[in-house]
A protein has these predicted regions:
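Long, Pro/Ser/Thr-rich low-complexity/intrinsically disordered regulatory tracts in eukaryotic proteins
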Residues: 1-278, 287-288, 295-613, 619-638
Length: 638
């Protein structure tokens, strides 16, 4: 009988968890040892050869395989954003803010072209590589079916502008001279006053730049044939400007929700009002608030952050505004009207635009952004504890994530390798054994404060050691990545490298650099601080976390996750408990208290100063990259 033995068969036993873990560890160790014996020497030899003739053994491959060969949408998945001053809006006049900001950006480009920007020095001594500055302006990422490429022009004398579904070309120079801020304001105001409607499908055309790269590449071929002049005007612009029809920024009525909406508008917008291929897009909201959307392949956050600090300081403190909120100076009635770009869109592109718009709206609607200023303590308190501020935050993030998920995860923190020629970034794996020991101790009621503090300091010291190793070229992940690329070129299968390559970063983190240049004293003008910026999660069920130290007493966090994930809910509403817990340990706070007074401005109470003396140019005048204007940069970067 077929089933005659069914009742006599034993049940399958559950193996010992110790045996299973040991066997898995033995297998992993065996795979690593096999890699060292059979393949590592050959792959390393090829890397050494490359290091002799290439300026950097890994950076070009990192740009190509991580960015340019990725077929995912740039929106959310790659591009990141930077915010305006948090508490201050120098003018509510949209065209005026755009005029000053564009003029300041082009002043930065002028100094860049003349090499008047001083190299950044680490600790005032070690120069950092400046190669990434070359592609800030006049740069576009061109889509390809299998691989994108970066197109960089030596010069461009116009910007591309988007407003209410229409595209314009605005010249930035007249008789070889940069237009004044007031003249630029005049041009932007002409666009705002233009009543002409968008042509059919023109309004949503930019959604194609948010589509998967192979899809956009195929559509672009038809677009280049039918609308070459308009496409060239956008892709050949110095940068892209979006004049949004909605306000943004911190509001008194609902500060938390308004900041979240501000971040979302910069990261994704409406899916069709940003040209995501441009090196960066300047976004000017209807109430005068600014923001930046940055394409990631050409450079990392410290580069765009350096430019953004200069722009905000220059347009506010050096250029300034008149008493009525307009740019200083006089309009130029002789300037021609901004050129409206016309797109001859063939019928076969219409469906592609509609599909791209639908996908962009789905992606935009799925991303959740939260921004919150943490004001219980800041960098000065951490420094008085004789701890690294970045390591402090990274360790407490492990505690916050464990309290959210009940488990640890592979954590990615990016740090710069610009101490070396054409260096970009390296990964610090922040979820260390020491960090896990600290977190377990914090969750163990039997552990004393002294024991927890000792473990906390061990975790911070371990992270600091990993950070220094990564910055000095002794990191792990970029080397493994380069070995993996060589193995693919040689068609060598490596279970060890395949396993490393498939790892998922459920917690992607980065510190946003701040005060890379000193154009004004932030201590004298504490309201004139930017909360930094953020980026999307690296994993469908993970978080993207960036943070920035605003002055001495506030830390701003930007947290992103996907609404479609049921596992990413609580960390986006973390509250101060996990962050404040280490600071409450007795020896950490002994001898001084966390700030009892509020920060320079309560994050819940915005103060708009459209006509403040500083906004009118009566504040400190920037020294514009004096010798003392290159302080030590922050160690981390996106």
């Amino acid at each position: 009988m077929l089933f005659s033995y069914q009742r006599s068969l034993p049940r399958q036993p559950v193996p010992s968890v110790q045996d299973t873990v040991r066997k898995d560890f033995d297998w992993t160790s065996g795979v690593a040892q096999e890699f060292l014996k059979l393949q590592a020497s050959l792959l390393q030899w090829y890397l050494q050869l490359k290091s002799w003739w290439a300026s950097n053994y890994v950076s070009d491959w990192w740009e190509e395989f991580v960015y340019l060969r990725s077929r995912n949408s740039l929106m959310v998945n790659s591009n990141y954003y930077l915010m305006d001053f948090l508490y201050v809006t120098p003018t509510p006049v949209q065209a005026a803010r755009a005029g000053n900001a564009v003029h300041a950006l082009l002043l930065y480009r002028h100094r860049l072209d003349r090499q008047e920007i001083l190299p950044t020095l680490l600790m005032g001594m070690r120069p950092l590589c400046s190669a990434q500055y070359e592609k800030i302006f006049n740069t576009t990422r061109i889509p390809g079916v299998h691989r994108d490429h970066i197109r960089h022009l030596r010069d461009s004398r116009h910007v591309a502008v988007f407003h209410r579904g229409r595209f314009f070309r605005v010249g930035t120079h007249s008789q070889s001279r940069l237009l004044s801020p007031r003249a630029l304001e005049q041009q932007f105001q002409r666009i705002l006053d233009d009543p002409s409607p968008a042509c059919p499908h023109e309004e949503h055309l930019a959604a194609l730049t948010a589509a998967p790269r192979d899809t956009w590449a195929q559509v672009r071929r038809s677009l280049k044939t039918q609308a070459q002049e308009a496409l060239e005007a956008v892709e050949g612009a110095a940068f892209f400007v979006s004049l949004d029809s909605e306000p943004a920024g911190l509001t008194r009525e609902d500060p938390a929700a308004s900041l979240d909406a501000y971040a979302h508008a910069l990261l994704a917008g409406r899916g069709h009002d940003r040209w995501f291929d441009k090196s960066f897009s300047l976004i000017v909201f209807s109430n005068g608030k600014l923001g930046l959307s940055v394409e990631h392949s050409w450079a990392d956050c410290p580069i765009s952050g350096h430019m953004w600090e200069f722009t905000l300081a220059t347009e506010c403190f050096q250029l300034g505004y008149s008493a009525d909120g307009h740019c200083k100076g006089h309009p130029d009635p002789s300037l021609p009207q901004p050129q409206r770009l016309h797109w001859d869109l063939p019928d076969k592109i219409h469906l592609s635009i509609s599909l791209a718009l639908r996908a962009a709206k789905t992606l935009s609607g799925n991303i959740e952004c939260h921004v919150f200023p943490f004001s219980r303590f800041g960098k000065s308190f951490i420094k008085r504890c004789h701890l690294s501020s970045d390591s402090f935050i990274q360790t407490t993030l492990q505690l916050a994530h464990f309290r959210d998920r009940g488990q640890f995860c592979l954590t990615y923190e990016s740090t710069m390798t610009r101490l070396f020629l054409e260096g970009r970034t390296e990964t610090v794996r922040s979820c260390t054994r020491e960090a896990c020991n600290f977190v377990r101790a914090m969750e163990d009621k039997e552990k004393t404060d002294a024991q927890c503090l000792a473990l906390f300091r061990l975790a911070v010291d371990k992270h600091q050691a990993l950070l220094k190793a990564a910055m000095s070229g002794q990191g792990v992940d970029r080397h493994l990545f380069a070995l993996y690329v060589v193995s693919q070129f040689l068609h060598l299968q490596s279970p060890f490298l395949d396993q490393v390559h498939s790892e998922q970063w459920q917690l992607a983190t980065s510190q946003i650099p701040v005060q890379q240049i000193h154009l004004f004293d932030v201590h004298n003008y504490p309201d004139y601080v930017s909360p930094g910026g953020g980026f999307g999660p690296a994993d469908d069920h993970g978080y993207g976390v960036s943070y920035m130290f605003m002055g001495d007493d506030v830390i701003t966090f930007h947290i992103s996750s996907n609404k479609s994930s049921t596992r990413t809910v609580r960390l986006t509403h973390p509250g101060p408990s996990s962050l404040g817990t280490p600071a409450s340990l007795p020896s950490c706070s002994s001898g001084f208290q966390t700030p009892s007074s509020p920060p320079a401005r309560d994050p819940g109470v915005p103060v708009l100063k459209p006509h403040s003396p500083q906004a009118q140019g009566q504040g400190p005048q920037p020294s514009c990259f004096s010798a003392s204007g290159s302080p030590s940069p922050s160690f981390s970067c996106t």
